[in-house]
Every structure is written in C-alpha cells, then in structure tokens.
C-alpha cells in the first residue's frame, strides 16, 4: 500500500460527534478529500518526525553522527506512524499548517511544539501558530477537544496524564524560543531518541 492508501484507511473513521469522516482519493489534484454535511476538507500528508537533516545550522552535528545511524533514523521516520494529515488547501492565499510549522522560527517543524500549539488553540491561548490554526478552525472543531484530537490521530503517547503536559522531545519552559533545535551531538541524540520512541509507540 502507498502512504496515501494508509492515510485513507487509518483516518476514515468515526469522529467524536458520531459522524463518519470518510476520506476519498478520487478528487482531482487533492491528496485526500472529504465532503459531507460537516464540511469540505482537502487534506495533505505531513511528517511527524523531523531529523533536521536539511538544517544547515546543525550540519556540524550531523557530521558527528555515523551514516548507518542516520539511515536508521530515516528508515523509522518514513514509516506510517511518522506521518499525519493536516488541511492542505490555502485559505486566502495564506500559508498552510504544514508550511507554517516549517517557516516559524519558534517551531522549526517540531511536532511536539506543534502539538503544544494545538493544545493551546483548543484552550484559546496565544501561541506561535495561533493565526494559522484559527484559519483552519473548522477542521480542528471536528474533534471537539484536544483530547478528541489526540485520540483520533493516535497521539496519546505524546501526552503525560500525570502532569497534564505534552511529552516534549527537548526541554520546554513555555517561552517558545527561536531556533528550538539541538545545539550539540548529545542534545541531538536525546531529541532523536525521544522522537523515535514516540513513533515506535504510535505504530504499536
């Protein structure tokens, strides 16, 4: 099966409100498509796990990690549990969630930080992605709550029930600093380990 076929199979299911979210691959120029009384949604695939392989700022760190290790990282991240779907259509010619995650210097494509922004969105709290998340609020409203979103997309392993917090891949102090990426080999390997553990758990 293709990644697209797996996405269709995984996310065509009942929503928290009881409605069925049927996804189609038959709409021209649309990766995944849904249209019903609950709305029209054009969805695209996006990676959960980020290796930072293409970030020049940490090229010197990657050079310290063996090629075999880098290949293992990529092999895991390019499996089904390493991906999710977001709305893929532009609204008013503005950036999509996928693009905003990558362009925002306070997120740097990290999914743990993206998920924290989504959590804050559901609570109406300011965050670095609030503008783009508000733009696609109809999509997030399908899941009724942050808990509903986590459950629908099988993200529960990123949530710590004991302290009611995201399980971040790097230390997080609520400040959303710019360039939240590893600064040395040890930080990078810890980041990769935590991220990889989540991808593996999500696939079980």
Predicted features and spans:
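Hydrophobic, well-ordered secondary-structure elements that form the walls
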Residues: 87
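Generic structural signal of hydrophobic/aromatic residues within well-ordered alpha-helices
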Residues: 2-7, 11, 27-28, 58, ...
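Intrinsically disordered, low-complexity N-proximal targeting/linker segments that flank membranes
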Residues: 1-68
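Sequence-level detector for tyrosine residue identity
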Residues: 20, 31-33, 41, 54, ...
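Residues immediately within or flanking Cys/His clusters that coordinate Zn2+
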Residues: 81-84
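Short, glycine-/Ser/Thr-/acidic-enriched flexible segments
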Residues: 90-93
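C-terminal, well-folded lobe of enzymatic/effector domains
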Residues: 95-204
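Intrinsically disordered, low-complexity acidic Ser/Thr-rich regulatory segments
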Residues: 38-79, 143, 159, 163-186
């Amino acid at each position: 099966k293709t990644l697209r076929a797996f996405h269709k199979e995984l996310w065509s299911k009942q929503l928290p409100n009881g409605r069925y979210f049927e996804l189609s691959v038959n709409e021209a120029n649309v990766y995944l498509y849904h249209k019903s009384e609950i709305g029209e949604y054009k969805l695209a695939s996006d990676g959960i796990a980020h290796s930072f392989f293409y970030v020049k700022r940490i090229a010197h760190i990657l050079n310290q990690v063996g090629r075999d290790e880098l290949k293992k990282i990529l092999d895991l991240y390019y499996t089904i549990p390493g991906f999710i779907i977001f709305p893929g259509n532009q609204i008013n010619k503005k950036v999509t969630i996928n693009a905003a995650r990558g362009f925002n210097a306070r997120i740097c494509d990290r999914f743990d930080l993206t998920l924290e922004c989504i959590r804050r969105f559901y609570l109406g709290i300011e965050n670095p992605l609030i503008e783009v998340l508000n733009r696609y609020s109809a999509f997030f409203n399908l899941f009724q709550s942050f808990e509903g979103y986590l459950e629908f997309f099988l993200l529960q392993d990123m949530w710590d029930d004991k302290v009611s917090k995201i399980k971040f891949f790097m230390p997080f102090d609520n400040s959303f600093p710019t360039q939240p990426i590893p600064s040395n080999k040890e930080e990078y390997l810890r980041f990769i380990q935590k991220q990889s553990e989540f991808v593996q758990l999500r696939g079980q």
